[in-house]
Amino acid sequence: MLKVGIFGATGRVGKLLIEEILNHTHFNLSSVYVRNELQYSLPSSTMVTKDFEIFLQASDVIIDFSSPEATKALLEVALSYPKPLVIGTTGLDNDIQHLLENASHTMPILYATNMSKGVAMLNKIGALVAATLKESDIEICEIHHRYKKDAPSGTALTLAQSCAKARNLKLSDVRISGRNGNIGERNSNEIGVMSLRGGDVAGRHTIGFYLDGEYLELTHNATSRLTFAKGALDMAKWIVTQKNGLYSIEDALEI
């Protein structure tokens, strides 16, 4: 039985992870890190703690769906107490990305802005289309619930990065997030990344490839956040078998 620690237990996905683990015979909810008192009860066998060292040492693998600041703190402590990590926190800045890369030299880390297998396939296929339909204009649109804090979503940026890489472009040079006023003609290399917020949408991502006379749109819809929790647990089972290094969900799916 795999002992799983949850970091970010009070978040939407964190709560779903806990529910899924408690209903799963192959996992043991071994530790939960909390800064404030939980509003729900957990089994007496689960270590609930504010101490990073105790939290890390109680588990075989850690799943993190928290905030960029919390993820940074986790990584800094994990350097002294290495554990396989599955990180799904979005909105990481360059400094945290570098910390993530450095930490992967001492432990296996799987980082993904989206734990959905369907999104992993969208990312792969999108890059293929971007490379093949070189003359197409690429526009990415993402929709999420009203409570999502970061925009564009980490998933949208990942999709945009893959499309840019497929065309040998640097995303920071070609990304456009929003258009307003008399902006002139569209640059052929632009990759538009647009964000909508409303309701309880779990996640919708569309990559559009627009040509003269036709267009192709690839869309992934998440109908429940449970797909992210299930995906993260699948990744946890995989990452504990890997050597030190930084991995993606595409590595786990071998695509």
UniProtKB/Swiss-Prot annotation:
CDD domains: DHDPR_N (cd02274). Pfam families: DapB_C (PF05173), DapB_N (PF01113). It is an enzyme of class 1 (oxidoreductase). GO terms for biological process: diaminopimelate biosynthetic process; lysine biosynthetic process via diaminopimelate. It is found in: Cytoplasm. One of its GO terms (cellular component) is cytosol. NAD(+) binds at G8, A9, T10, G11, R12, V13, G88, T89, T90, A112, T113, N114, M115. It comes from the Bacteria. The keyword Transmembrane helix does not apply. Its EC number is 1.17.1.8. Pathway: Amino-acid biosynthesis; L-lysine biosynthesis via DAP pathway; (S)-tetrahydrodipicolinate from L-aspartate: step 4/4. Keywords: Amino-acid biosynthesis, Cytoplasm, Diaminopimelate biosynthesis, Lysine biosynthesis, NAD, NADP, Oxidoreductase. (S)-2,3,4,5-tetrahydrodipicolinate binds at H145, G154, T155. Its main location: cytoplasm. The keyword Amino-acid biosynthesis applies. The active site is at H144, K148. One of its GO terms (molecular function) is NADP binding. Gene3D superfamilies: Dihydrodipicolinate Reductase, domain 2, NAD(P)-binding Rossmann-like Domain. It catalyses: (S)-2,3,4,5-tetrahydrodipicolinate + NAD(+) + H2O = (2S,4S)-4-hydroxy-2,3,4,5-tetrahydrodipicolinate + NADH + H(+); (S)-2,3,4,5-tetrahydrodipicolinate + NADP(+) + H2O = (2S,4S)-4-hydroxy-2,3,4,5-tetrahydrodipicolinate + NADPH + H(+). Catalyzes the conversion of 4-hydroxy-tetrahydrodipicolinate (HTPA) to tetrahydrodipicolinate. HAMAP family: DapB (MF_00102). Belongs to the DapB family. This is 4-hydroxy-tetrahydrodipicolinate reductase. It comes from Helicobacter hepaticus (strain ATCC 51449 / 3B1).
